[in-house]
């Protein structure tokens, strides 16, 4: 039996967590669970987003199943997702979007996996208020982080017998930061001659995804673009509720739904787990 850590989260988080655990038990998954209340509600009750016991559990099990957590917009505490990704070096956010015959959409042949770098870019959250009318945000792209996410995308492609990896970037404008990411992509692509590779500017990718999603296989991208385009791919298959998300590091892994905490329907038991 494998023990996993479970975070119940906010809004619909507790009720869908209970439903998922019921499903896993009915399927006789060889798992035991250490369950914790975390998030904004826990912060209001006890002054901590995550109880220390929850950190201890994750550091022991190395495997986390997390439900949605509310993040204040424009104020308040930092995103708990970002905190967990950085604390445990969960550098690869992998989001597969695949058409489901049970859900009718205009796009029946979608099968796209997005590899999103998870620890840097604008999501490092380094913002400086120069004066009341000016704010600077720092975008960080490093060779180390770029190499590992790009190489992981190609290794996955080879292992899963996929055909193409596309680098998504904005190097036409961000010539140094995205330019570095793109140049590293081209270097690593040479190590995988059996896998087709190409690169596309992010705005063009958004247009092409809603016109010809069947032309995409695996996408690898810096943090911000990956967050946006993976949500777009969820729309192609029927919505965020159908898109799983894996946050993978060298030693730890976190699995979660992509959608939010939906406080407006919390407790109504109408959210599909």
Regions found by a protein language model. Give the residues of each.
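N-terminal beta-loop-helix "entrance" segment that forms/cooperates
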Residues: 30-53, 209
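Glycine-rich phosphate/diphosphate-binding loop of Rossmann-like nucleotide-binding domains
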Residues: 4-26, 131-203, 215
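Glycine-rich phosphate/nucleotide-binding loop
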Residues: 40-42, 209-273
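Short acidic loop-to-helix transition motifs that present clustered carboxylates
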Residues: 41, 200-207
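Short, acidic/small-residue loops that bind anionic groups at enzyme active sites
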Residues: 86-99, 191-200, 242-257, 266
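N-terminal glycine-rich phosphate/adenylate-binding segment common to multiple enzyme folds
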Residues: 43-139, 224
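Solvent-exposed alpha-helices and their adjacent loops that cap or buttress functional pockets
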Residues: 56-58, 104-108, 158-159, 189-190, ...
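Buried hydrophobic positions in well-ordered alpha/beta secondary-structure cores of metabolic enzymes
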Residues: 10-13, 62, 115, 153, ...
């Amino acid at each position: 039996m494998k023990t996993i850590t479970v975070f119940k989260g906010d809004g619909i988080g507790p009720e869908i967590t209970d439903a998922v655990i019921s499903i896993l038990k009915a399927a006789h998954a060889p798992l035991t669970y250490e369950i914790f209340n975390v998030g904004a509600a826990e912060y209001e009750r006890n002054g901590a987003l995550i109880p220390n016991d929850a950190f201890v559990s994750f550091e022991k099990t190395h495997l986390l199943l997390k439900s949605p957590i509310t993040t204040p917009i424009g104020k308040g505490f930092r995103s708990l997702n970002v905190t967990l990704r950085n604390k445990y070096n969960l550098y690869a956010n992998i989001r597969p979007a695949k058409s489901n015959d049970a859900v009718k959409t205009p796009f029946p042949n979608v099968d796209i996996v997005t590899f999103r770098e998870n620890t840097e870019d604008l999501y490092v959250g380094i913002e400086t208020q120069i004066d009341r009318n000016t704010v600077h945000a720092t975008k960080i792209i490093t060779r180390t982080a770029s190499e590992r996410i790009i190489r992981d995308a190609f290794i996955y492609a080879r292992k899963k017998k996929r055909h193409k990896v596309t680098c998504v970037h904005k190097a036409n404008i961000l010539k140094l930061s995205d330019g570095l990411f793109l140049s590293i992509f081209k270097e690593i692509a040479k190590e995988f001659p059996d896998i087709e590779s190409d690169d596309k500017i992010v705005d063009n990718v958004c247009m092409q995804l809603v016109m010809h999603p069947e032309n995409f296989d695996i996408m690898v991208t810096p943090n911000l673009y990956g967050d946006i385009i993976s949500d777009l791919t969820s729309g192609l298959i029927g919505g965020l509720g159908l898109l799983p998300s894996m946050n993978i590091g060298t030693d730890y892994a976190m699995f979660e739904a992509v959608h939010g905490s939906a406080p407006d329907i919390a407790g109504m038991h109408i959210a599909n787990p």
